[in-house]
Amino acid sequence: LPREIFPLSTLGTSAVNSAIQLVILLGAIVVTGAIPSLAQLAYLPLALVVLVVYATLFALLLSALNVYMRDIQHLIEVITFLAFWASPIVYSYSYVQKALAVNYPVAHEIYLANPVTLAILGFQRSLWAAGIDQPYPVHLMIRLAVAALIGIVLIFGAHRVFARLEGNFAQEL
């Protein structure tokens, strides 16, 4: 049994939970009649790919590091907390755009370099009918594709780290 199955099993659990939530969301979309167009739905697969790719990347990398450095588990909590607040989950992207785009364009681009932010914006663009009139980053689809490609390349590096460290897992645990 490959050892990669252990960190990736957490992704499977999250996928099942997310699928249940997606079914509920789709039901709400149908009930409210706010059915997105095909152009909007085009963002959904790419947003999902970005989310899965980076979840896989961090699952492999951080699980391997956690075996050797137990405090990584606390760092994961901090990273999750920061990723939550650094993404337009509880606030609108329009606030960020107003605050950063004109006066601080470099900070705005750094904000948009966060793959979680791009995935959230992709989900909002595809499934949130009220979000149609909201501002979105220029070339969101291209940004999502680039983030996905970068993540796929980084997965190979994360797997290499995992493979290099897995030989001593039993000793360390």
Give the location of each predicted region.
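Alpha-helical transmembrane segments and their short interhelical loops
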Residues: 3, 8-79, 83, 140-160
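Juxtamembrane helix-loop transition sites at the ends of transmembrane segments
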Residues: 35, 92-98, 168, 172
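Short alpha-helical basic/polar micro-motif
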Residues: 63, 117, 163
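Short cytosolic juxtamembrane segments of multi-pass membrane proteins
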Residues: 71, 163-173
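Hydrophobic alpha-helical segments
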Residues: 82, 89, 122, 126-130, ...
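Short hydrophobic, aromatic-rich alpha-helical segments embedded in or entering the lipid bilayer
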Residues: 87-141
